[in-house]
Amino acid sequence: MEKLRLLGLRYQEYVTRHPAATAQLETAVRGLSYLLAGRFADSHELSELVYSASNLLVLLNDGILRKELRKKLPMSLSQQRLLTWLSVLECVEVFMEMGATKVWGEVGRWLVIALIQLAKAVLRMFLLIWFKAGLQTSPPIVPLDREIQAQSRDGDHSSGSQEQSYVGKRSNRVVRTLQNTPSLHSRHWGAPQQREELGVAPTPLGLQETIAESLHIARPLLHLLSLGLWGQRSWTPWLLSGVVDVTSLSLLSDRKGLTRRERLELRRRTILLLYYLLRSPFYDRFSEAKILFLLQLLADHVPGIGLVTRPLMDYLPNWQKIYFYSWG
């Protein structure tokens, strides 16, 4: 146990001293998951295991860095724990579904899916009702930007209380000072942005917004319940889920006063409505043939594009069959 504790302390020290190298390690692990997919029997399960591990690694390293940088989330310890558990579930849900299918078959698969969705819904309702956490964003905990954190640490040591930018008297343009201009390889050539702090408190929700968010949280459970009642080939679960999603977004149409992250979350949910084109039974009856025909057409007539479209054609049917990919 003592050796494990010392090993953990060494790893924490390495992460805090080398955030950029840690990010490269995370990227390498994630890249390995892409290389493993489709290489051999059970490669999809192994690939998903490695991908889940990379996401958990990011979550662990971010926690270490936040502790070192004293960038605590603006919430209680209990709320942080709920968000952490929710993040862990989102990291491993696909692998758990695939593993349950491999070990217990379809019955075990749907049981695991139902338990995970129920756990996520309970956690989110606690966050919404008890902790007044506002809109539930994805991912639940925003990953740290390692490059920005490294620059901010260097800036804290070097610039002290110096102004990082000034406003031109005539043009009113915000310009970096020379002392705070980053190195050439890491410089952003646009105008310096006023970054929104991760510690901004969520926007308080009124009754209408709370109902809308409750619908969004309950939608996966309603979909699973309707699947059990009417079956996977019925249009009822597909239509019910779509109506709930559209209703939730309609009730959240007033975006005044929302934080930048909350506006991005609503935009993400709107874009995800396109997933209904890839969800059964619509995909089976309408989308599948057209999408595969288009990908084959691109592969045959556009030089080089086949390197991307042909693996995508092979992987798309497997992707569509995994619940947490298409419906999660």
Curated annotation (Swiss-Prot):
The keyword Transferase does not apply. Residues 66-81 are annotated as: Required for peroxisomal location. It comes from the Eukaryota. It is a multi-pass membrane protein. Residues 213-328 are annotated as: Interaction with PEX19. The keyword Membrane applies. GO terms for cellular component: endoplasmic reticulum membrane; peroxisomal membrane; peroxisome. Keywords: Membrane, Peroxisome, Peroxisome biogenesis, Transmembrane, Transmembrane helix. Residues 106-110 are peroxisomal. Residues 1-84, 132-328 are cytoplasmic. Residues 149-169 are annotated as: Disordered. The chain crosses the membrane at residues 85-105, 111-131. InterPro entries: Pex16 (IPR013919). It is found in: Peroxisome membrane. GO terms for biological process: ER-dependent peroxisome organization; peroxisome membrane biogenesis; peroxisome organization; protein import into peroxisome membrane; protein targeting to peroxisome. Belongs to the peroxin-16 family. Required for peroxisome membrane biogenesis. May play a role in early stages of peroxisome assembly. Can recruit other peroxisomal proteins, such as PEX3 and PMP34, to de novo peroxisomes derived from the endoplasmic reticulum (ER). May function as receptor for PEX3. Interacts with PEX19. This is Peroxisomal membrane protein PEX16. It comes from Bos taurus.
